[in-house]
């Protein structure tokens, strides 16, 4: 609940600060008594103002401490965002290198696949050729002679068994390439899934940090609004204190004028200082009490009936 300083002073001192018309039963209150009453009221107002100043100072210090804490949190959050952005950039560089490496591996796998297809085609041809040769060998030994002639015409193979060994080597190479390709594909799929998961986590963290920034900014704006309200109230307190000080000065001036007038009319010789308002009020009160006593005696004298004259007998 916000503290309304104006309503507080209005409720606490409305009856004291407003100038009231005296009631009929206060017709006989002396001006000195009224001045003393006003002075007591001014002391109460000054005490209340002093209390409010202390409360305001304490709340101002609390708000300043809260503002410092919010600014420190904001600096820490900015530093975290800077480090996190650096982390993202580093991981983005790693991701690009991984993608480049995966692309190179895919190209190599594609090249190896083409080589495998080529070797497979060659292998198929060799198998067909072997089968034909076996059939022909079974049917006629002419094929053996044919192979011998082929071996004689080429420098690549020296014996028929070398051709068979070459075929087995090509088959083993093909199987090895197929296994490597399958492994590379599985690795690429795993890296892709890991990258997608990392991107989702990164987006969630960025969203959470943005929400925290928005919340801290809202708290900072509210703290600034509260500080502005208290600054306005402090200005109002200072204005009220200035008005009360001016009013007190007027009361002291009126007291001094009344004291000087009474001293002059009654020809009193006193050594009371012009700054000693309390002593002046006491002197004024004594004079008014004396005048009231004289007035009362005069009233009594007027009310005593006069004794009629006794006639003398001649």
UniProtKB/Swiss-Prot annotation:
- Which controlled-vocabulary keywords does the entry list? Coiled coil
Coiled-coil parts of chain: 34-139, 175-233
Q: Does the keyword Coiled coil apply?
A: yes
* One CC-aspect GO term: cytoskeleton
The record's similarity note reads: Belongs to the CFAP73 family.
Tell me which PANTHER family the record gives: COILED-COIL DOMAIN-CONTAINING PROTEIN 42 LIKE-2 (PTHR21683:SF15), COILED-COIL DOMAIN-CONTAINING PROTEIN 42 LIKE-2-LIKE-RELATED (PTHR21683)
Q: What is this protein called?
A: Coiled-coil domain-containing protein 42 like-2
Its taxonomic path starts at:
Eukaryota, Metazoa, Chordata, Craniata, Vertebrata
């Amino acid at each position: 609940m916000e503290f309304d300083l104006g309503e507080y002073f209005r409720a606490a001192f409305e009856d004291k600060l407003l100038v009231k018309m005296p009631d009929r039963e206060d017709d006989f209150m002396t001006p000195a008594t009224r001045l003393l009453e006003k002075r007591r009221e001014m002391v109460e107002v000054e005490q209340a103002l002093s209390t409010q100043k202390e409360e305001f100072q304490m709340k101002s210090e609390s708000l300043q401490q809260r503002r410092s804490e919010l600014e420190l949190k904001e600096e820490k959050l900015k530093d975290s965002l800077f480090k996190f952005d650096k982390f993202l950039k580093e991981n983005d560089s790693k991701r690009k290198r991984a993608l480049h490496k995966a692309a190179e591996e895919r190209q190599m796998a594609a090249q190896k696949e083409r080589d495998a297809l080529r070797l497979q085609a060659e292998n198929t041809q060799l198998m067909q050729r072997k089968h034909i040769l076996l059939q022909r060998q079974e049917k006629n030994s002419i094929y053996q002679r044919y192979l011998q002639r082929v071996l004689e015409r080429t420098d690549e193979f020296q014996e028929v068994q070398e051709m068979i060994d070459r075929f087995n080597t090509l088959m083993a190479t093909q199987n090895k390439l197929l296994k490597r390709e399958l492994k590379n594909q599985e690795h690429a799929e795993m890296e892709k899934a890991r990258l997608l998961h990392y991107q989702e986590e990164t987006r969630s963290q960025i969203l959470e940090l943005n929400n925290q920034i928005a919340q801290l900014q809202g708290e900072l704006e509210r703290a600034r609004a509260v500080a502005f309200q208290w600054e306005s109230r402090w200005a109002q307190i200072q204005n009220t204190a200035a008005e009360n000080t001016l009013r007190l000065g007027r009361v002291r001036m009126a007291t001094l004028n009344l004291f000087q007038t009474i001293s002059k009319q009654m020809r009193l010789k006193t050594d009371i200082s012009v700054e000693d308002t309390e002593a002046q009020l006491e002197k004024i009160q004594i004079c008014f009490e004396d005048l009231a006593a004289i007035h009362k005696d005069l009233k009594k004298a007027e009310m005593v009936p006069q004794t009629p004259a006794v006639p003398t007998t001649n």
